[in-house]
Amino acid sequence: MNRTSIESGFITFADRLIRWKWGVLLAVVILTALLFSHLPKITIDTSNEGFLRADDPVLLQYNEFREQFGREEVVLIAIRPVDLFAPEFLTKLKQFHAEIEATVPHLDEVTSLVNVRYTVGKDDELLVEDLLEAFPDSDEGRKQLKQAALNHPFYQDLLISENGALTTVVIETRAFSEEAGGDALTDGFEDAPAEESATAETERTFLTDEENGEVVAAVMQLVEAYQGEDFPIEVAGSPIVMEVLKKSMQSDMRQFTLTMVAIIFLFLFLLFRRVTGILTPLVVVILSLVATIALMALSGTALKLPTQILPSFVLAVGVGDSVHILSIFYRRYDHTGDKLEAIRFALGHSGLAVVMTSLTTAAGLFSFSTAELGAVAELGVFGAAGVLLAMFYSLILLPTLLAIFPVRRKHHKSSDSEADEEGNTVTGMMDRLLNRAVSVSTNHAATVVFVAAILFIVAIAGITQLQFKHDVMKWLPEEIPIRVATDHLDRDLNGTISVEVIVDSGEQEGLYNPQIIGALSKIQDELDHFGDELNGLDAGKRISVIDVLRETNQALNENQAAYYVTPKERQLIAQELLLFENSGSDDLENLVDSELRTARITLRLPWRDAGSYTAIVDEVQERVDQALPEGVESQVTGLMMIFARTLDAMMTSMAQSYTIAAFVVTMMMILLVGHIRLGLISMVPNLLPITIVLGFMGITGLPLDAFTMLIGSIALGLAVDDTVHFMHNFQRYYRQSGDTVEAITHTLHTAGRAMVVTTIVLSLGFLIFMRSDMNNLINFGGLTGMAIILALLADLLLAPALMTLVFGKRN
């Protein structure tokens, strides 16, 4: 690489910017305005399935399930009265149920003791009624109601806890967004022309975050109105978790963005103490941030949980480019008094380094673009775009603004008076720190490298203890109501999250087949016991068409408990299903398809880390396959499967992104320094901090989740920036003097100052995440900030030590 010609090219580029400054400014304003016009289109997606790519096979199966059977994610409202069957409580429960149906939007169904089906046979007739359709008005009636409710198998762990102390209201929302023009479920048992149905399906979108928020807001408003000592309420369920995460995400983004702007303002003031030194970098980074979000809106990409770090990240990274350019510009301008010449000099001196640092940071982020986790891939793409936009504004808009607006000059002082003044300033303190770094790294180079090697070995031992985890509930504070409620309901109902088994008989009315019904019955009974065989999980409620058949069969046989079994003859199965359907109940729609070809089995389990679900999903699939007759197909889906797939994709994504980032950044370093051996050596200060942080996580038991897995590639992309500036300047000064120590000294006293400042800003940009209420962001911010600080230490101590050992302390 011919640096001289490249630097000359940047000087020529600066000349053209200066010559056409007003035209350049107008062009930048127009392009920026066009981008900004798309900002209102930005959306938010905190759904669990939002982590995966849209074409992920597991997600596609889950979407097919939702299209057929509706949304499985429910809001669970738990009420713990003093007496569950007291007339006053039942009256209030009925009112509460009615208000939910009347006021909560996007509803599909509400189920409680008020309207749960009660199947009974009377006078040779099958009756499927609401449990509280005939409200008991006597002690004997209430006693019978209590006995019927507590002894009914279908109500256990669904609407009533085993000890009878708790009852629930289950709220199911529509699967599809009403904004898309489609109804919730047109499948059911309605007939529609095939072409019309297909067209409607393509137009549908699933319930949006905004609509989910409307549901949660309406529910919580009712809960607040009814909450009391006689009606104590807890609320759980995935829709609530999604809304809590969204609110936290919006609050954190707003808080962290404003804090980051304030931090940047403060450090720019301390560093430059000039209006242009504060305002121009702020304009650059704010435009870079807003343009990045606008690009997301333009592409139809929603803000998701991982991408919430983008604002603080783009602000922190973007200011580094401006600081490096302005540091050189002001030093030159104060010395010569020629503003335009100082602009040319600054771009000629720093232009290549800014491009290389931007490209390496973008490469570190873009390595996520191949991730199997869709949200992480989007972070990689738009994080890289934000870095490149910051480079664009720094190299084009920043010099243009400097050329247009007046810049205050600090008159150049004699070296003695300047040194005397700087001895009592932040700059003087920084110079003493850098002098100490030069002394330690060059006089004790072998010791520095030896200590680094020991740290590396210890870190590798820690890395072997790393564990992947994905549990969005653990991201929330322990005392937050949704987490407390989920723990309570998992304990009392044995489950708030479901795994869904879909069984396809392969033919119309295949569910009349006694073999298939017998297999479904066996599967449902076995699922009651296997949970505690795996990871100590107690299986909760099982729901399927088997419940309907058993209830109907019992009702048609004088309500005798001995007949709570599935019929064994095809004709009897068909008759009982037909009788149930004609009874007026629509419960069958949620359990089988309209052709009676496909059946659904739901199993509720406690909320745990996704790693606990992987073995369960595999075991469920194995047992289902063993029980079903030959030719009958099955698949396991549901929210639990989404969690398990997210964890699997997380591990694959991390391995891919780390490998790609390390390879690409190494190639770019080799290209920059123009030497393979030197390029490889220069990667040591970049990789060591990441290794230490990962080792620290393993030793302390901090998990690798969807956020902390990002640390390696992000930190590598950022750490290499300082190394690029160090190597770029070291080679320049070494060519001039041929003296290693002198080259290191000049490097740290020019680029070193900017490296320290940008590291402080960058690390604070991530450390502010520790102010979040979400545990995953606290871990991510603290660990990434730690990696960035370690990277600076590596570039101030390890990189000079390596150069001393490679080139020797000779003139």
Describe the function of each predicted region.
Residues F267, V355-L398, L402-A403, T666-I670, ...:
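Hydrophobic, glycine/alanine-rich multi-pass transmembrane helices and their short helix-loop junctions
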